[in-house]
UniProtKB/Swiss-Prot annotation:
Keywords: Cell outer membrane, Membrane, Signal, Transmembrane, Transmembrane beta strand. Residues 1-20 form the signal peptide. GO terms for cellular component: cell outer membrane. One of its GO terms (biological process) is transmembrane transport. It is found in: Cell outer membrane. InterPro entries: OMP/PagP_b-brl, OMPW. It comes from Rickettsia typhi (strain ATCC VR-144 / Wilmington). It holds the Pfam family OmpW. Belongs to the OmpW/AlkL family. This is Putative outer membrane protein RT0057.
Length: 240
C-alpha cells in the first residue's frame, strides 16, 4: 500500500510540473510574472528530515537446531523511527548528488530472542527490557530531477550506503552492513529559499547476526537478517 502511494505521488508530481511548464512557456514577458519566483535557488541544498522506518527483519541461514519442540524464530526487529541531515550539490538543473548521515532506531523483538534461546541453548532465559538496534547510515546518492522548475519538483535517485550497526540487546551482536539504496521524493519550493521535502528511500541491507553465550551457551549461532528498511521522511530544506 505504501509503495502504491509513493508511485501515485510521483506520477502526480510529474503531471503538475508538466502543466506548470506549459503555463510558464506561454506567459508573455510583458506580464506581471515575477521572474525571480522559484528562480533564485542556489546550487547547494541542506535538508533535515524525520521519518518512520518499515523493516521486515527476516532471518536466513540459522543452523540446524537440536530442540525436541522447536519454535518459530520470526522477525528479529520491529518498525522504528529516525532522522537524517543531508547536503545536495547540483551540477546542473537536472543532475545532483546527495550526501546524508542518518540515525535510525529499530526495536528488537524479544519473542524472537527467546525462540533462539529455546531452540539452540538456554531455556527460560531472562531478557530484561527491550533494547533498540541502531542503524547509522552514511549515504551517497546520485539524483535526477525530472522537472526542475516551478514550485513542485520530483526526483529519483540511486546510490550506496554504509551503515554502522549496534545494539544493547541482551545476547545479540549485529555486524555493520553496506549495499545499494533507491530514492524517490518531491521538493516543494517556497519563495524565500526554503522548501518542504518528502522523501522515500529503500535501503538494501543484510547484516550478520551473532548470538551470545547467555542465549545459546557454547554453541556458535549466526544468521543473516534481511532488514531492507524502507524509510519515509518529511523535512525542511534551505538553498544556498
Amino acid at each position: 500500500m505504501l509503495k502504491k502511494l509513493c508511485v501515485i505521488l510521483f506520477i502526480s508530481s510529474i503531471t503538475i510540473n508538466s502543466h506548470a511548464k506549459n503555463m510558464y512557456d506561454n506567459v508573455d514577458t510583458a506580464t506581471s510574472y515575477d521572474s525571480t519566483y522559484y528562480e533564485n535557488e542556489g546550487s547547494l541544498v541542506f535538508k533535515m528530515r524525520l521519518g518512520g522506518i518499515f523493516a521486515s527483519a527476516k532471518q536466513k541461514g540459522l543452523p540446524t537446531h537440536s530442540s525436541v519442540q522447536p519454535v518459530s524464530v520470526g522477525e528479529i526487529a520491529k518498525n522504528g523511527y529516525g532522522g537524517d541531515a543531508s547536503t545536495t550539490i547540483f551540477f546542473n538543473n537536472y543532475l545532483a548528488a546527495e550526501l546524508s548521515l542518518g540515525f535510525n532506531v529499530l526495536r528488537t523483538k524479544y519473542t524472537s530472542l527467546a525462540a533462539v534461546a529455546h531452540n539452540y541453548g538456554i531455556n527460560n532465559v531472562k531478557l530484561g527490557k527491550h533494547k533498540p538496534i541502531y542503524m547509522i547510515p552514511a549515504t551517497l546518492t546520485g539524483q535526477f530531477h525530472i522537472a526542475p522548475y516551478g514550485g513542485i519538483r520530483p526526483y529519483i535517485g540511486i546510490g550506496y550506503h554504509g551503515s554502522y550497526m549496534l545494539t544493547q540487546a541482551t545476547g545479540l551482536k549485529i555486524r555493520n552492513g553496506y549495499n545499494a539504496v533507491g530514492q524517490i521524493g518531491v521538493d516543494f519550493y517556497a519563495k524565500d529559499d526554503t522548501l518542504i521535502n518528502i522523501d522515500v528511500r529503500q535501503f538494501f541491507l543484510k547484516p550478520k547476526l551473532e548470538y551470545k553465550s547467555n542465549l545459546v551457551g557454547n554453541k556458535k549461532v549466526t544468521s543473516k537478517v534481511k532488514l531492507n528498511p524502507l524509510i519515509v521522511s518529511i523535512g525542511i530544506g534551505f538553498t544556498f
